[in-house]
């Protein structure tokens, strides 16, 4: 097995980012999932060294493996991330497709977020000594909600953070003692972690303190409930940092997940009891195949590829945004101070919101922008950096069916021509219900089944493949939204028609905005010249001699609200 150190490619406007170490098998097998390892706080990727040979022995074959140091640790000690979202985005960039994530402690919490946000490239999740919520949520307690009983008390965590700020060396020594506490192989764990500790207060303290804050910020309870991939969670029964009871409670959040525990193990069971951990992982990998969303992968790739030219080609999309803002928010009044743009693309909708509602840019205002396509998010950030208003926008790379936000985060959400790409519309609307505050609004535009009627009809004269995406009817969208608990306030539909001078012109524009065929049943490979000629002949049946070839769109504008009283939606 060969080892290769790889520096991930960077966008032109930023320096190269994270190192990763890749172990390549001598005889790689196609379509085999790549094992990607993320370490915990206060360590680096070297803590996997003693475990990997035992794991490979249990698996009985070689695997491609990738080991990543978090920013500020190990080979990436000279890198820092401004915030949690930036860190997650950079990690997602270097994780290969068809990955199985294996994370320990903080690495497990980060792996859970990544799996939740990227079902298109992460097929399985394995966590070791990982709590869904590491620190108790004071706001939850203040609101009278049932807290996660198995999280660390905030006062205890604050004492640790303050101790690290005042005396990092002494605090790290204490941390190693906590990780080995209760383990039957306590001396082995202590010696291993001490020998691998590499810390410089001068250069790394700020980055390590930032990483500590991630333990406070991450709340994976919703992510675990929504996770579509198979998952295994391993706990030590004597863990002094993450009680084994957290695993039993996690089973209540996600009944299909595997939860295992190891007697006489503490916080680092892969170090003290490697054979037991390896056996559990081997059993899981053999019985649980990766579950990747190929559709979401195609969506992310299509829109990322279209990002640079999108604004020059998206004439319908801009028109629909203008109509959506006018229809749903044009009557005046306050839209709230914390808003979400779901499927933000290159940010045109945000531009319109900032123009029409300047109060959003006040110090207490905040816009969150989420998209699954990294290229779109990069382009949007670049635009708003140039405009000088990026300070008021939080950018999130993620999946709209598993929103990375706590309950009741937003006063409102706007989403233009995004909902039609949902793989599970009920899950999407349920997530939106969860993320909205009581009384919050959700304004959306989406496409109906008559969209691209002429193109679909022309293709039917040529072959049986699904060349045009399928979209839900207005009644179906309304039914799913109400099933999720949202109330329909207003809606309208329109059928704009765009004209093209040729079929090539139409197809290039669809591809240029990323909206070419995503559905299953499409034809793979390139289209032959004879097939394309038959399509052109069929499409000529709709030719308007004065304006060209028509392309009809069916657009729905829908305004929903979450009831002030949740019982009203029951």
UniProtKB/Swiss-Prot annotation:
Q: Mention one GO biological process in which this protein takes part, according to its record.
A: methylation
Where are the stretches annotated Malonyl-ACP O-methyltransferase? Answer: 280-570
- The UniProt annotation puts the region (Disordered) at 1-29
Pathway membership of this protein?
Answer: Cofactor biosynthesis; biotin biosynthesis
Chain positions covered by the region annotation Carboxylesterase? 1-279
Indicate the segments annotated as coiled coil, or none if absent: none
- What reaction(s) does this enzyme catalyze? a carboxylic ester + H2O = an alcohol + a carboxylate + H(+); malonyl-[ACP] + S-adenosyl-L-methionine = malonyl-[ACP] methyl ester + S-adenosyl-L-homocysteine
The Gene Ontology terms for molecular function here are: carboxyl-O-methyltransferase activity; carboxylesterase activity; malonyl-CoA methyltransferase activity; S-adenosylmethionine-dependent methyltransferase activity
Biased composition of type Basic and acidic residues is found at: 12-25
Q: Keyword check for Hydrolase, yes or no.
A: yes
Chain residues that bind substrate = 41, 105-106, 175-179, 267
Enzyme Commission number, as recorded: 3.1.1.1, 2.1.1.197
**Keywords, sorted A to Z:** Biotin biosynthesis, Hydrolase, Methyltransferase, Multifunctional enzyme, S-adenosyl-L-methionine, Transferase
The active site annotation covers 105 (nucleophile), 239, 267
Under HAMAP family, the record lists:
BioC
Q: Which family does the UniProt entry place this protein in?
A: In the N-terminal section; belongs to the AB hydrolase superfamily. Carboxylesterase BioH family. In the C-terminal section; belongs to the methyltransferase superfamily.
The task this protein performs is described as: Converts the free carboxyl group of a malonyl-thioester to its methyl ester by transfer of a methyl group from S-adenosyl-L-methionine (SAM). It allows to synthesize pimeloyl-ACP via the fatty acid synthetic pathway.
Q: What is this protein called?
A: Biotin biosynthesis bifunctional protein BioHC
